[in-house]
């Protein structure tokens, strides 16, 4: 396997900073970079794209074909596998309508996160334990190792599919607009980080985010399966409770602790030490910061749910992002209006 760079810096892996050190050093590095940029503007951006971006048309075509492939595969899996399974298990109608979406996402994110974990812990890549190493030996147009390129193709094409799926296939939720923005930002980050050869940090970002989606969809599946066929299944209820606790913990630990202190610290501060004139520094850090803000936004849902459980307002697990029955009825179009279908699930609500 091609090595991505030295396993450590001259003095070994740098200790992970505190939040205060991240803000102080990251902000200081950004200010220094802004002051030192004497020709910042569209001219510099155009030169940077011409000199440092390497993305061939066949690669974009492959990405688009992959997105179409994911969409076709999901439609086939929903019709041939997930819906028949929901019917055979006698799920309640509302749960049976939502189960295919969660099953699809659970299988994808379980596979993608497992592969990212393999790259970070089953190979020689040192990026998790030594995040600054993501920029060691960086050069414009450097070769992308095949194992990382495969991960990028799978993830990039899936997020291309997810933009379409959020609009036309998924259940419409209170955060669907933010989810759509998240998918667009993620796709831009995947494509641009590949073009500028920041793929090493990209693998770390994907690893730190996908685990929460695995646990979220696992929990939702067990919620759907705990009441079926006129019976209450305690094993699924227990799995849902444990999954909910694990999901909340992993969201904070992976997305709000490790992600800023490993990824944002490396991109905002350490990158300039390794590559002083690193191209599109502000562009990538702005997108990563936006991703952090969206992680905080969704964490508020987790905190709100925990508060409702502790105060006795909620007695069973539910997705606070989903519209309840009363809201759904009030948001449905009148009979005289043309109904807007949300893909395979239900009416879409704006």
Curated annotation (Swiss-Prot):
Changing residue 183 to Q: In EPM8; expressed and localized properly to the ER; impaired ceramide synthase activity. GO terms for biological process: brain development; cellular response to dithiothreitol; cellular response to mycotoxin; cellular response to UV-A; cellular response to xenobiotic stimulus; ceramide biosynthetic process; negative regulation of cardiac muscle hypertrophy; negative regulation of D-glucose import. Pathway: Lipid metabolism; sphingolipid metabolism. The chain crosses the membrane at residues 53-73, 103-123, 148-168, 176-196, 239-259, 287-307. It catalyses: a sphingoid base + octadecanoyl-CoA = an N-octadecanoyl-sphingoid base + CoA + H(+); sphinganine + octadecanoyl-CoA = N-(octadecanoyl)-sphinganine + CoA + H(+); hexadecasphinganine + octadecanoyl-CoA = N-octadecanoylhexadecasphinganine + CoA + H(+); sphing-4-enine + octadecanoyl-CoA = N-octadecanoylsphing-4-enine + CoA + H(+). It is an enzyme of class 2 (transferase). The lineage of its organism: Eukaryota, Metazoa, Chordata, Craniata, Vertebrata. This protein is produced by a bicistronic gene which also produces the GDF1 protein from a non-overlapping reading frame. Ceramide synthase that catalyzes the transfer of the acyl chain from acyl-CoA to a sphingoid base, with high selectivity toward stearoyl-CoA (octadecanoyl-CoA; C18:0-CoA). N-acylates sphinganine and sphingosine bases to form dihydroceramides and ceramides in de novo synthesis and salvage pathways, respectively. Plays a predominant role in skeletal muscle in regulating C18 ceramide and dihydroceramide levels with an impact on whole-body glucose metabolism and insulin sensitivity. It is found in: Endoplasmic reticulum membrane. One of its GO terms (molecular function) is sphingosine N-acyltransferase activity. SMART domains: TLC. Its main location: endoplasmic reticulum. GO terms for cellular component: endoplasmic reticulum; endoplasmic reticulum membrane; intracellular membrane-bounded organelle; membrane. It comes from Homo sapiens (Human). Pfam families: TRAM_LAG1_CLN8 (PF03798). It is linked to Epilepsy, progressive myoclonic 8: A form of progressive myoclonic epilepsy, a clinically and genetically heterogeneous group of disorders defined by the combination of action and reflex myoclonus, other types of epileptic seizures, and progressive neurodegeneration and neurocognitive impairment. EPM8 is an autosomal recessive form characterized by myoclonus, generalized tonic-clonic seizures and moderate to severe cognitive impairment. PANTHER family: CERAMIDE SYNTHASE 1, LONGEVITY ASSURANCE FACTOR 1 LAG1. Keywords: Acetylation, Disease variant, Endoplasmic reticulum, Epilepsy, Lipid biosynthesis, Lipid metabolism, Membrane, Neurodegeneration, Transferase, Transmembrane, Transmembrane helix. This is Ceramide synthase 1. Acetylated. Deacetylation by SIRT3 increases enzyme activity and promotes mitochondrial ceramide accumulation. The modification N-acetylalanine is found at residue 2. It is a multi-pass membrane protein. The keyword Metal-binding does not apply. Changing residue 68 to M: In EPM8; uncertain significance. Residues 97-311 form the TLC domain.
């Amino acid at each position: 396997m091609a090595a991505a760079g030295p396993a450590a810096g001259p003095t070994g892996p740098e200790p992970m900073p505190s939040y205060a050190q991240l803000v102080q050093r990251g902000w200081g590095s950004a200010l220094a970079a802004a002051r030192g940029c004497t020709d910042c503007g569209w001219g510099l951006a155009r030169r940077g794209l011409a000199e440092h971006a390497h993305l061939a048309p066949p690669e974009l075509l492959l990405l688009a074909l992959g997105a179409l492939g994911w969409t076709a595969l999901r439609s086939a899996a929903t019709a041939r596998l997930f819906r028949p399974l929901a019917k055979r298990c006698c799920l309640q109608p509302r749960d049976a309508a939502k189960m295919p979406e969660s099953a699809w996402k659970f299988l994808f994110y379980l596979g993608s996160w497992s592969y990212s974990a393999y790259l970070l812990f089953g190979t020689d890549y040192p990026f998790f334990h030594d995040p600054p190493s993501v920029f060691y030996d960086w050069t414009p147009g450097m070769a992308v190792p095949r194992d990382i390129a495969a991960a990028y193709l799978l993830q990039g094409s899936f997020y291309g599919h997810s933009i379409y799926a959020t609009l036309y296939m998924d259940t419409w939720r209170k955060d669907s607009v933010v989810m759509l923005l998240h998918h667009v930002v993620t796709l831009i980050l995947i494509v641009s980080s590949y073009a500028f050869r920041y793929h090493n940090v990209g693998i770390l970002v994907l690893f730190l985010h996908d685990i929460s989606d695995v646990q979220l969809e696992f929990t939702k599946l067990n919620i759907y399966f705990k009441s079926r066929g006129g019976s209450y299944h305690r094993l699924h209820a227990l799995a849902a409770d444990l999954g909910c606790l694990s999901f909340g913990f992993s969201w904070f630990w992976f997305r709000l602790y490790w992600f800023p202190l490993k990824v944002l610290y490396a991109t905002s501060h350490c990158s300039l030490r390794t590559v002083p004139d690193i191209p599109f520094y502000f562009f990538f850090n702005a997108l990563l910061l936006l991703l952090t803000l969206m992680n905080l936004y969704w964490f508020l849902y987790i905190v709100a749910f925990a508060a409702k459980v502790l105060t006795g307002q909620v007695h069973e697990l539910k997705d606070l992002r989903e519209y309840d029955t009363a809201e759904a009825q009030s948001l449905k179009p009148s009979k005289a209006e043309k109904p807007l279908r949300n893909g395979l699930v239900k009416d879409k609500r704006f």
